[in-house]
C-alpha cells in the first residue's frame, strides 16, 4: 500500500490502521469505528466490488483523500458470508480500549480472522455439508494431506502415493480452503480450486509439526494416534494446525486427536468414479437425483454430514459393516418414534465447536439445553431395542442432567441473538444481577417506600419523592413546610412554591440506578463467560454424545429407507464376486413413473467379466451403475435395492463411463477416456469392481476396436478384476469363446416399423443388432436422413452380411475388410437372359442400364 511509504504524515488513527493492515496484507481488514466496520484504500476498492457497496472518501490523510467503504456492525455476518463464499478471508479488528479514558485513538486489535476453511458461525456454514480446511505437502516420495473440520474438531491426515490418488482425495474432501507450500510442484493439481493459500516453507517443517501436535494433544509423542511414521502427512497437519490457531486467536480444546486415513481401510474411488456415480453431486453440479438425495432423510444436520462421509468412504472392515446391518435391522420397528425426538436434538456437534472456541451465542446454549432435554426420552426408547450396538450408542450419548439443570436455571427460554443485547441470563440465577436489573427496570417501588417512610418520620404531608433528567432524584417539600426539613436534607433546587432536597441514601441509590444498566450488562457478560467455564470441562463427553447421536440418526435413517424403499440386507462372502437377484438402480427407480425393471447379475472367479451389448438407451449404463451403487451401499452397512445380494471383498471401484472434452486442460474426449483407462489398468486388482463403457469410440474404428479388445483381454486374463464391459463393437462378443471367465449378456429391444420398445431386461448372450437407426428416429433425426441411412445400411449389409459375427483374431478384422462394391448395372446384366428379349424389351433394357451407371 502506497500509504505506508509516508507513514508519519498520516493522522494517529490512520497510523494505527496502517500498522494493523501491515500485519494482514493479503486479506481484507474490517476496522471497527463506532457502529461500523470501515475498510480503507485498496481494501475499500475490493470490498465495494465484491459486496456491491458504495465506495466513498474519508477526509484526507498525508494530503490525499482516503478511499473508504463501510458496513454496519450489526449486519456484519451477512457480508462475511458473501466474502467467504467468494473465497475471501477477513481480519476482524475491534475496539478493546475505553474511548472515555483513551488518549489518542482507541486501542484496537484483530480478535479473529474469518477464512473459508475456519468458519464456525452458523450463518456462514451450510448445515448439511462439511466445511474443511486442508493442507497439502509434496516431496520425492509422494504427498501429505491433512484436513480439519473446525466446526466439529475432526482432524485427519493421509499420504497419497501418487497424483491420481491425491486428485481423488481432493475431490472427495472438496476443501473450502487449501494451504500449499510456496514451492509446491504439482500446481496443475490444485489450480482453479477455491480458497488457495500459499504458505512459507518453514510452516511445513516436520519437527515444528510434531511439537505443535504434541502441544495441542498434551502428549509426548504421536505413537498413540498411529501417525508417528507419516512424515509427509504430519508436515501438512502441522501447517494446518498453526494456521487454524493463528486465525482463531484462541485455544482449540475441541481438537483432541488426529486420525490416519489408510487406503486399505476403505474402498478407493478415484475422482472420475465419484463423479460418474453421482454420489452427492450430479454431473451438472447439483444435488438432485444423486445417491445421497435418495438415502439422506436424516433429521439432524450432523447426521446428514456423517452419512455423506460414509458414502464417500465405504469401509472394508466387515465387522463394522455387520454391526451396522444388525443395528439397522433392530431399529426398523422404532423409526417412527425415534426420528421426531432426534429432530429436536439439532446440530449439537457444531454448537460444541463454538462452545470450545468461546464464540457460542445465547441461542446456541438454548439449543444445547433443548438437545439435553431430549436425551431422557431417547434413552428410554432405545432401552427397548434388543441390540448390543444400539445399547453402546445409548450409553455413549449420556444424559447430562446437571448441565441441563444448569442451562435451565441460567438461560431464559427464548434468549436474544447476542449477549450484548442483554436479557440472556434468567431471573433467579444470580442475586446481584437481579438487584441491578431491578434498579435498571425502574425505581418505583423503592421510591414509594421511601416517600411513605420519610412522611411518617418527618410528619410533613407535602413531602414527595421524584425524579427529573437534569437534577436526578429528589425529595420535594412545599415552601410552607420547608423550614421543618430535617438537618440531613441537603438543598438541591429551589422552586417558586417548593424546595427540593437530596439525602445520602437517595444519592447512593441514584448512583446505583444510573449505572445499573451498564453494571447489569457487564455482570451478565461475566456470568455468560462463566457458563463456558462450567461447560467446557465436559467437552470430551459432550463431543462423544454428539457423535453417538449423529450415528444414531444415520442408522435410524437407513432403517427407515430400507423399510420404505423395500431394500434387503446384503450378505458378505469371502471370495471375490457379486451375485445380485432382482437388482435395481436406487436413484433411477425413484424418478421413473413406471415400475423399474429389476435385473440379475452374477460375477465370480469363474465369471469375472460380462461383455454387455444392446441398443443405445437400452439400459447398459444404468445396469452398470446400479451394480456399483449396490456395492457402495453394501460397504457403508446399508441395505440395498435388490431381492438378494451376496458380495465379496472389494478394494476399489473404477468407472470409465461417458466423457466430455476437458477444454480447460486442452484434452479431447478420447484423451480423457484414455487417461481414465490407463489409471484403471495400472491400479485395478482381482478385488476391484471395474465398469468400462464404450472404450475406444473416440478414435477410428480400427484403433478403437483394437484398444477395446486389448483392454478387455488385460482385465480378464491378467488383472482378473470383476468387470462390466459395455460395447458396441460386436467383435468383442467373441471373447467368451477365446478366454475363460468371460460371458456375454445383452439388453433387448423390440422394433416395430419405425418405433422401438426397450425391454431393459438383461439376457444371456450377445445382442442381435444395435437398433441405432430406431434410436436416432426416436431422437427426432429428420425422416429423410433416417430413410437414407436405412438404404445405406441395406447396402452395407448386402456387402458384408455377417458383419456382426465376424471372427477377430488380432491380425484380421473382416468387418473392416470391406470387399469392393459391385455395380448395380453389372448385377442386372448378370441376371439378364438376352435370348428371351423382344426387340422392344431389349431397347428398354438399354435405357434402364444407362440409368444404373
Curated annotation (Swiss-Prot):
A biological process term (GO) from this entry: mismatch repair
SMART domains documented for this protein: MUTSac, MUTSd
Classification via PROSITE patterns: DNA_MISMATCH_REPAIR_2
Classification via Pfam families: MutS_I, MutS_II, MutS_III, MutS_IV, MutS_V
Summary of the function given for this chain in its UniProt record: This protein is involved in the repair of mismatches in DNA. It is possible that it carries out the mismatch recognition step. This protein has a weak ATPase activity.
Domain of life of the source: Bacteria
UniProt cross-references to CDD domains, sorted A to Z: ABC_MutS1 (cd03284)
Residues engaged in binding ATP: 614-621
Protein name per the record: DNA mismatch repair protein MutS
Gene giving rise to this polypeptide: mutS
Cellular component aspect of the GO annotation: cytosol
Naturally occurring in which organism (per UniProt): Escherichia fergusonii (strain ATCC 35469 / DSM 13698 / CCUG 18766 / IAM 14443 / JCM 21226 / LMG 7866 / NBRC 102419 / NCTC 12128 / CDC 0568-73)
Gene3D superfamilies in the record: 1.10.1420.10, 6.10.140.430, DNA repair protein MutS, domain I, MutS, connector domain, P-loop containing nucleotide triphosphate hydrolases
Family per record: Belongs to the DNA mismatch repair MutS family.
Keywords: ATP-binding, DNA damage, DNA repair, DNA-binding, Nucleotide-binding
Amino acid at each position: 500500500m502506497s500509504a505506508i511509504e509516508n507513514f508519519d504524515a498520516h493522522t494517529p488513527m490512520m497510523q494505527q490502521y496502517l500498522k494493523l493492515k501491515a500485519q494482514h496484507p493479503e486479506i481484507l481488514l474490517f476496522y471497527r469505528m463506532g457502529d461500523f466496520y470501515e475498510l480503507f484504500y485498496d481494501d475499500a476498492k475490493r470490498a465495494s466490488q465484491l459486496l456491491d457497496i458504495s465506495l466513498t472518501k474519508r477526509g484526507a490523510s498525508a494530503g490525499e483523500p482516503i478511499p473508504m467503504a463501510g458496513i454496519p456492525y450489526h449486519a456484519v455476518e451477512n457480508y462475511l458470508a458473501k466474502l467467504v463464499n467468494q473465497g475471501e478471508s477477513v481480519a476482524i479488528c475491534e475496539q478493546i480500549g475505553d474511548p472515555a479514558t483513551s488518549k489518542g485513538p482507541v486501542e484496537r486489535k484483530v480478535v479473529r480472522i474469518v477464512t473459508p476453511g475456519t468458519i464456525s458461525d452458523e450463518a456462514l456454514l451450510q448445515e448439511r455439508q462439511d466445511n474443511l480446511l486442508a493442507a497439502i505437502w509434496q516431496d520425492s516420495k509422494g504427498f501429505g494431506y491433512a484436513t480439519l473440520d473446525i466446526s466439529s474438531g475432526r482432524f485427519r491426515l493421509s499420504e497419497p502415493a501418487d497424483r491420481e490418488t491425491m486428485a481423488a482425495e481432493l475431490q472427495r474432501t472438496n476443501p473450502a480452503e487449501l494451504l500449499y507450500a510456496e514451492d509446491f510442484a504439482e500446481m496443475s493439481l490444485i489450480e482453479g480450486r477455491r480458497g488457495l493459500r500459499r504458505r512459507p516453507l518453514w510452516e511445513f517443517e516436520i519437527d515444528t509439526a510434531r511439537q505443535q501436535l504434541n502441544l495441542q494433544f498434551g502428549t509426548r509423542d504421536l505413537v498413540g494416534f498411529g501417525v508417528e511414521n507419516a512424515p509427509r502427512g504430519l508436515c501438512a497437519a502441522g501447517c494446518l494446525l498453526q494456521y487454524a490457531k493463528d486465525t482463531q486467536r484462541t485455544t482449540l480444546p475441541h481438537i483432541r486427536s488426529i486420525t490416519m486415513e489408510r487406503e486399505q481401510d476403505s474402498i478407493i474411488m478415484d475422482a472420475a468414479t465419484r463423479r460418474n456415480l453421482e454420489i452427492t453431486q450430479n454431473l451438472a453440479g447439483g444435488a438432485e437425483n444423486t445417491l445421497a438425495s435418495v438415502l439422506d432423510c436424516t433429521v439432524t444436520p450432523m447426521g446428514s454430514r456423517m452419512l455423506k462421509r460414509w458414502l464417500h468412504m465405504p469401509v472394508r472392515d466387515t465387522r463394522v459393516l455387520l454391526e451396522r446391518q444388525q443395528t439397522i435391522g433392530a431399529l426398523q420397528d422404532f423409526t417412527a418414534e425415534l426420528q421426531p425426538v432426534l429432530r429436536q436434538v439439532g446440530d449439537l456437534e457444531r454448537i460444541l465447536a463454538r462452545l470450545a472456541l468461546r464464540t457460542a451465542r445465547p441461542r446456541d446454549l438454548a439449543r444445547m439445553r433443548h438437545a439435553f432435554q431430549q436425551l431422557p426420552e431417547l434413552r428410554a426408547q432405545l432401552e427397548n431395542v434388543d441390540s448390543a450396538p444400539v445399547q453402546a450408542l445409548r450409553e455413549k450419548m449420556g444424559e447430562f442432567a446437571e448441565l441441563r439443570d444448569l442451562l435451565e436455571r441460567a438461560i431464559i427460554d427464548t434468549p436474544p441473538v447476542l449477549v450484548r443485547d442483554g436479557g440472556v441470563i434468567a431471573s433467579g440465577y444470580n442475586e446481584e444481577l437481579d438487584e441491578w436489573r431491578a434498579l435498571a427496570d425502574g425505581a418505583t417501588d423503592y421510591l414509594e417506600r421511601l416517600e411513605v417512610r420519610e412522611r411518617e418520620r418527618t410528619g410533613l404531608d407535602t413531602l414527595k419523592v421524584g425524579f427529573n433528567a437534569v437534577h436526578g432524584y429528589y425529595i420535594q417539600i412545599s415552601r410552607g413546610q420547608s423550614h421543618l426539613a430535617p438537618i440531613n436534607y441537603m438543598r438541591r433546587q429551589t422552586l417558586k412554591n417548593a424546595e427540593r432536597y437530596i439525602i445520602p441514601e437517595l444519592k447512593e441509590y441514584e448512583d446505583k440506578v444510573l449505572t445499573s444498566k451498564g453494571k447489569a450488562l457487564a455482570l451478565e457478560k461475566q456470568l455468560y463467560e462463566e457458563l463456558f467455564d462450567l461447560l467446557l470441562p465436559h467437552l470430551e463427553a459432550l463431543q462423544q454424545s454428539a457423535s453417538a447421536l449423529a450415528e444414531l440418526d444415520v442408522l435410524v435413517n437407513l432403517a427407515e429407507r430400507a423399510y420404505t424403499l423395500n431394500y434387503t440386507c446384503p450378505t458378505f462372502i469371502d471370495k471375490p464376486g457379486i451375485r445380485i437377484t432382482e437388482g435395481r438402480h436406487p436413484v433411477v427407480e425413484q424418478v421413473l413413473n413406471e415400475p423399474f425393471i429389476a435385473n440379475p447379475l452374477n460375477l465370480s472367479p469363474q465369471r469375472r467379466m460380462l461383455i454387455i451389448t444392446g441398443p443405445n438407451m437400452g439400459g447398459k449404463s444404468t445396469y452398470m451403475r446400479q451394480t456399483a451403487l449396490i456395492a457402495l451401499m453394501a460397504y457403508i452397512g446399508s441395505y440395498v435395492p435388490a431381492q438378494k445380494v451376496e458380495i465379496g471383498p472389494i478394494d476399489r471401484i473404477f468407472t470409465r463411463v461417458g466423457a466430455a472434452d476437458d477444454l480447460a486442460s486442452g484434452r479431447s474426449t478420447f484423451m480423457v477416456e484414455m487417461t481414465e483407462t490407463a489409471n484403471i489398468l495400472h491400479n485395478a486388482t482381482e478385488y476391484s469392481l471395474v465398469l468400462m463403457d464404450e472404450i475406444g469410440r473416440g478414435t477410428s474404428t480400427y484403433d478403437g476396436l483394437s484398444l477395446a479388445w486389448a483392454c478387455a483381454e488385460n482385465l480378464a486374463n491378467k488383472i482378473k478384476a470383476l468387470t462390466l464391459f459395455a460395447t458396441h463393437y460386436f467383435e468383442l462378443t467373441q471373447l467368451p469363446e477365446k478366454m475363460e471367465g468371460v460371458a456375454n449378456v445383452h439388453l433387448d429391444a423390440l422394433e416395430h416399423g419405425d418405433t422401438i420398445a426397450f425391454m431393459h431386461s438383461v439376457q444371456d448372450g450377445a445382442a442381435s443388432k444395435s437398433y441405432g437407426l430406431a434410436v436416432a428416429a426416436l431422437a427426432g433425426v429428420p425422416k429423410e436422413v433416417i430413410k437414407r441411412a436405412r438404404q445405406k445400411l441395406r447396402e452395407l449389409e448386402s456387402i458384408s452380411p455377417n458383419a456382426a459375427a465376424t471372427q477377430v483374431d488380432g491380425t484380421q478384422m473382416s468387418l473392416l475388410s470391406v470387399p469392393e462394391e459391385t455395380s448395380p448395372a453389372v448385377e442386372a446384366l448378370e441376371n439378364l437372359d438376352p435370348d428371351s428379349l423382344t426387340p422392344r424389351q431389349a431397347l428398354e433394357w438399354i435405357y434402364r442400364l444407362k440409368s444404373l451407371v
